[in-house]
Swiss-Prot record:
Top-level taxon: Bacteria
Organism listed in the record: Burkholderia lata (strain ATCC 17760 / DSM 23089 / LMG 22485 / NCIMB 9086 / R18194 / 383)
General function of this protein: Plays a role in cell envelope biogenesis, maintenance of cell envelope integrity and membrane homeostasis.
Transmembrane annotation, as ranges: 3-23, 24-44, 49-69, 81-101, 121-141, 149-169
Keywords linked to the UniProt accession: Cell inner membrane, Cell membrane, Membrane, Transmembrane, Transmembrane helix
The encoding gene: yciB
A Gene Ontology cellular-component term: plasma membrane
Protein name per Swiss-Prot or TrEMBL: Inner membrane-spanning protein YciB
Compartment annotation: Cell inner membrane
InterPro entries hit by this protein: YciB
Family membership noted in the UniProt record: Belongs to the YciB family.
Topology with respect to the bilayer: Multi-pass membrane protein
Length: 176
């Protein structure tokens, strides 16, 4: 259910784009992300840093898209967000000694610390590659194809990555 909730702004962006175009879709994505943050704050009294970063990036890049009437800003937004996530994961681990992947998943999984470090680096690399892939699609495909990639391509890549990660982790999980 959380996965669908996380996709909420992207799905609304996609639907609005198909009906009204990129600028209305951008406004819808901003409002949907604001609503998402408000709901999480109301419901849980705490909003994850990643969601705050997502909100900041959509407001800045979406706002620039609307004010300057230039779709390139919203098209760059996923790349900036993915690269911020990658940098955040690596900086937290290697500059501050905090493995954010372990903090997020440590209650569900018991893994040796070197495995957590590999997982952290794998996620950082995954986000870095997603950022590059987004730029490639932005500069080599149509706006409509980019919107399809944004929903289906990145979501599909995420699902495949999680499945591969799960398969890799099975050799480290203890029988319970």
């Amino acid at each position: 259910m959380k996965f669908l909730f996380d996709l909420f702004p992207i799905i609304l962006f996609f639907a609005a784009f198909k009906v009204w175009g990129i600028f209305t879709a951008t406004a819808v994505a901003i409002v949907a992300t604001l609503a998402q943050v408000a709901w999480v704050a109301f419901r849980h009294r705490k909003v994850d840093t990643m969601l705050w970063v997502s909100l900041g990036v959509i407001v800045v890049f979406g706002g620039a898209t609307l004010v300057l009437h230039d779709e390139k800003f919203i098209q760059w937004k996923p790349t900036v967000l993915y690269w911020l996530f990658a940098i955040g994961l690596l900086a937290a681990r290697y500059a501050f000694g905090n493995n954010l992947i372990e903090k997020m998943m440590g209650k569900q999984l018991t893994l040796p610390h070197p495995v957590w470090d590999k997982l952290n680096v794998a996620w950082a690399l995954f986000f870095a590659v997603l950022g590059v892939a987004n730029l490639y699609v932005v500069h080599n495909f149509t706006e409509s194809q980019w919107v399809n990639f944004k929903l289906f391509g990145t979501t599909g890549a995420m699902v495949v990555f999680i499945i591969l990660q799960s398969l890799w982790l099975t050799k480290y999980l203890k029988d319970e």
